[in-house]
Amino acid sequence: MKTLTVELGERSYPIFIGQGLLGQAELFKPYVTGTQVLIVSNTTVAPLYLEKAKQAFSGYDVKTVILPDGEQYKNLDVLNQIFDVAIENRFDRKCTFVALGGGVIGDMTGFAAASYQRGVNFIQIPTTLLSQVDSSVGGKTGVNHPKGKNMIGAFHQPECVVIDTDTLNTLEDRELSAGLAEVIKYGLIVDYPFFEWLEQNLPGLLARDPVVLAEAIERSCQNKATIVAKDEKEAGLRALFNLGHTFGHAIEAGMGYGNWLHGEGVSAGMMQAVYLSKLMGDLTQTDQKRIAAILQSAHLPVMPPKEMSVQQFLDLMAGDKKVQAGQIRLVLLKAIGQAYVTGDYPAELLERTLIEYR
């Protein structure tokens, strides 16, 4: 088992990475407050891992909530199902919420924990590659609104993140690829040696080699933990994690939540950001081709959906939560491993990107 730490002073917390961790009850006990535990999962993950999770919290008063699976259910109406169970069972302020699932479950459980009685303890047990390397770490929680992704939410850090890599054995190939988009993102924004390693080890990742997967997860989490420790509330440096996300969120919303997976939208969105970076004179065509090649090798889309118009992109991007004073701020690349955030780009180049890169 590997242990990393997200350094946030008194609110620092560990990330445990290894095989078979879900079966280690003693691992969880130091991070549970009170006697009541609410495990939130979904209809896909619960049949596979809920019983094992309940055993990990044996000795506590455990209740469960099983939500429908999919980004289209990440909304306030479905969120209320978590509150309903907590309130009906008189969960108090000492209770612990546990997220058992992918990014949607983690985001919703975290937001429920941030909101219930003005904030209760919660633990992340991410079961998809995307949630293991990205959404479970850093304390971002929330739900979608019909007019935008993650527009309603809060920063609420978990007590710990437990990454049992065995859960990836049951992950669908499409979900694995979606997670690889976020893994590749770390190489693109801050870690060129990791990008090179990914180019060499992508076959092992796709084959679910446990050693290769564990290293990719560890290096991704370390990159995220380092930046979150410096910029918890996304005042500056942490915004680099949004490479491809402004374009990608527009794709997810425009195509209807759940039709494009988050990682798929991010992949196509990263290529749009790469194209704009090239138009800005920052990124070489060689780098553009390398980035496209690794995403395609990971079975990810490198083009946005043709159904979306330029105006639809612009309208959805203008509603993004990262917009400041009406300015769409984007993460662009100077080179692989060197990202920067800017709103200082010619509007005609953004429009040209949306017209030409499709």
UniProtKB/Swiss-Prot annotation:
GO biological process, one term: amino acid biosynthetic process
InterPro entries: Dehydroquinate_synthase, DHQ_synth_AroB, DHQ_synth_fam, DHQS/DOIS_N, DHQS_C
UniProt: Zn(2+) binding residues: 182, 245, 262
Substrates-to-products reaction catalysed: 7-phospho-2-dehydro-3-deoxy-D-arabino-heptonate = 3-dehydroquinate + phosphate
MF term (GO), any: 3-dehydroquinate synthase activity
Binding note for cofactor: Binds 1 divalent metal cation per subunit. Can use either Co(2+) or Zn(2+).
Enzyme class: lyase
Highest taxon above the source species: Bacteria
Names of the cofactor(s): Co(2+); Zn(2+); NAD(+)
Subcellular location as annotated: Cytoplasm
Predominant location: cytoplasm
The EC number(s) this enzyme carries: 4.2.3.4
Function: Catalyzes the conversion of 3-deoxy-D-arabino-heptulosonate 7-phosphate (DAHP) to dehydroquinate (DHQ).
NCBIfam families: aroB
Protein's name according to its UniProt entry: 3-dehydroquinate synthase
Species of the source: Hydrogenovibrio crunogenus (strain DSM 25203 / XCL-2) (Thiomicrospira crunogena)
Gene coding for it: aroB
